[in-house]
From Swiss-Prot:
Enzyme class: oxidoreductase
Family as reported in the entry's similarity comment: Belongs to the carotenoid/retinoid oxidoreductase family. CrtISO subfamily.
Tissues/organs with expression: Highly expressed in liver, kidney and heart.
Signal peptide: 1-21
Keyword NADP: yes
UniProt-recorded name of the protein: All-trans-retinol 13,14-reductase
Subcellular location: Endoplasmic reticulum membrane
Lineage of source species: Eukaryota, Metazoa, Chordata, Craniata, Vertebrata
Names of required cofactors: NAD(+); NADP(+); FAD
Length: 609
């Protein structure tokens, strides 16, 4: 019996290899044939110069001719897809509904200061890391990454017996030692946990492979149990974080501390997979980084590459629908311009608007209910929404004693129970029972801040919320949602500020202004479906190997592709992987192999020097 099983495994592996090799037979140019990184130029601070790149408003005259593709949405998933295609000689138009390009990478002004919308910190940005290498290739090396302090994260547990602090230090050895100092009786558990994190995270390439292989083949591999048998990553994608931590024998408090980073993906330990959690822990374990001059630099240095290939990135361009030809193939988009609709035709349409917006709103009604479309939507649900608080402070980071460290504040070790109770409460009671706060200090992370905004600082607070608490006002115009809406937002702000002032008493009398945005703000500015911070929920169903294989760049609509976080994972690096998967599908090239080859070439050249 075992011989038959072994032969079957070998046969399947041979088939997988042959199919995989046969997938990439396209003749498209290699976008990563040469290293385009060049010495960084001086930072551009002139507002008009930046506006010409980031705020090019849509007009018919600015639409390039003979387009190869149109991208809906200018978040990193959309911009990176466009940039990669541009490097392959494609002329791409990116359409952004907001007034400024960048999606969650854009910044905005408040009370004379600058705030980020979604980039709080990024891991593995040292020279030589693959994420840094990819970004260097689509920005020509113009992004500069500033390392954050160590500890880069500080978990604070507020309990009946007082406050406990758990620092997360940069460097694997230092990270582990920091945990062991807090839990000396659980050193063996910590060692087993960290080894499992390493093994699982290093198998993430299996998730990428699942999205390349034909779906029937992945279903066959899943049916025979080969995915979970041979891939630690796939196996961990069928286990919840809570399940694994309990199996390791961690105490309730250690379980809470090891799970502290959950706000970066928005799901509690019982409802997300250990594989996703391991990816995030491994991503940051060597330390965290922040883009010098803020997150708008990402879009600012990606857009010129798209433009030089004959493409454009246009704002104030709300896409109303994806156009289909008589055969049901995507052939362009319809853009709202004033009271009129402008049709733009192209052979390929790429949506960075998320699965829900794309399938439920942008497709013609005649195809929204196709079996394959409905099947994909049954695998996902909208993710967690958050309320954002933006605080302007008087004083430098030194005067206010602010570090670049992020603060994760919890009030209970049972995160599942606390969150479930919280989101099920009436909205009037919820502010009294906020289960966690995420508090970053953007101004303390940016080395250029003091030159640009002397003697002032910023602080951001993210509070988990239920979209249902704000849903009754979603049809009301921005700024005209009424007293009850503003009162609810203020109640959350006041509850959060009460906690903040206890944590940072030195800020008393230093607060200049406090503003905030609800999930409706995310929905308005970022076109986030139901205000979801991370798109489709990163729960057990979405991250199961079968769903991972099914949710890919290719859609049931020919010539329509998805990019960004909904086809891989959340965050800058997750959305960037989505862009590589999307571009690989369009170009019919294995861009991961192309990047690997270029990386080897660059390393060899450096050795010669």
């Amino acid at each position: 019996m075992w011989i038959t099983a072994l032969l079957l495994v070998v046969l399947l592996l041979v088939v997988v290899h042959r199919v995989y090799v046969g997938l990439f037979t396209g003749s498209s140019p290699n976008p990563f044939a040469e290293d385009v990184k060049r010495p960084p130029e001086p930072l551009v601070t002139d507002k008009e110069a930046r506006k010409k790149v980031l705020k090019q408003a849509f007009s018919v005259s600015r639409v390039p001719e003979k387009l190869d593709a149109v991208v809906i949405g200018s978040g990193i998933g959309g911009l990176a897809s466009a940039a990669v295609l541009a490097k392959a000689g494609k002329r791409v138009l990116v359409l952004e509904q907001h007034t400024k390009a960048g999606g969650c990478c854009h910044t905005f002004g408040e009370n004379g200061l600058e705030f980020d919308t979604g980039i709080h910190y990024i891991g593995r940005m040292r020279e030589g890391n693959i994420g840094r290498f990819i970004l260097d290739q689509i920005t020509e090396g113009q992004l500069d990454w500033a390392p954050m302090a160590s500890p880069f994260d500080l978990m604070i547990l507020e309990g009946p017996n007082g406050r406990k602090e758990f620092p997360m230090y940069s460097g694997r050895k230092e990270y582990i030692q920091g945990l062991k100092e807090k839990f000396p009786k659980e050193e063996a558990v910590i060692d087993k946990y960290m080894e499992l994190v390493k093994v699982v995270a290093h198998g993430v390439s299996h998730a990428i492979l699942l999205k390349f292989l034909p779906l029937p083949l992945t279903q066959l591999l899943n049916k025979f149990g080969l995915l979970t048998r041979f891939s630690p990553f796939c196996r961990a994608s069928t286990q919840s974080l809570a399940e694994v931590l309990k199996q390791l024998g961690a105490s309730p408090e250690l379980q809470a501390v090891l799970s502290y980073i959950l706000p970066t993906y928005g799901v509690t330990p019982s409802h997300t997979t250990f594989s996703l959690h391991a990816l995030l822990v491994d991503h940051y374990i060597q330390g965290a980084y922040y883009p010098r001059r803020g997150s708008s630099e990402i879009a600012f240095h990606t857009i010129p590459l798209i433009q030089r290939a004959g493409g454009a990135v246009l704002t104030r361009a709300t896409v109303q629908s994806v156009l289909l030809d008589s055969a049901g193939r995507a052939c362009g988009v319809s853009v709202k311009k004033g009271q009129e609709l402008v049709n733009i035709y192209c052979p390929v349409v790429i949506s960075n608007a998320g699965m829900f917006n794309t399938y439920q709103h942008l497709l013609p009604e005649s195809v929204r209910y196709l079996p394959d479309v409905k099947k994909q939507l049954t695998m996902v649900k909208p993710g967690l929404s958050m309320l954002s608080i933006f605080i302007c402070l008087k004083g430098t980071k030194e005067e206010l004693k602010l570090q670049s460290t992020n603060y994760y504040v919890y009030f209970d070790t049972d995160m599942d129970k606390a969150m479930e109770c919280y989101v099920s409460m009436p909205k009037e009671k919820a502010p009294e029972h906020i289960p966690l706060l995420f508090i970053p200090f953007p101004s303390s992370k940016d080395p250029t801040w003091e030159d640009r905004f002397p003697d002032r600082s910023t602080m951001t607070v993210l509070v988990p919320t239920a979209f249902e608490w704000f849903e009754e006002w979603q049809e009301e115009p921005k700024g005209k949602r009424g007293v009850d809406y503003e009162t609810l937002k203020n109640t959350f702000r006041e509850a959060s500020m009460s906690v903040i002032m206890k944590l940072f008493p030195q800020l008393e009398g230093k607060v200049e202004s406090v503003t905030g945005g609800s999930p409706l703000t995310n929905q308005y500015y970022l076109a986030a479906h139901r205000g979801a911070t991370y798109g489709a929920d990163h729960d057990l169903a979405r991250l199961h190997p079968h769903a991972m294989a099914s949710l890919r760049a290719q859609t049931p609509i020919p010539n329509l592709y998805l990019t960004g976080q909904d086809i891989f994972t959340c965050g800058l690096m997750g959305a960037l992987q989505g862009a590589l998967l999307c571009s690989s599908a369009i170009l019919k090239r294995n861009l991961y192999s192309d990047l690997q080859a270029l990386g080897s070439k660059v390393r060899a050249q450096k050795k010669k020097k």
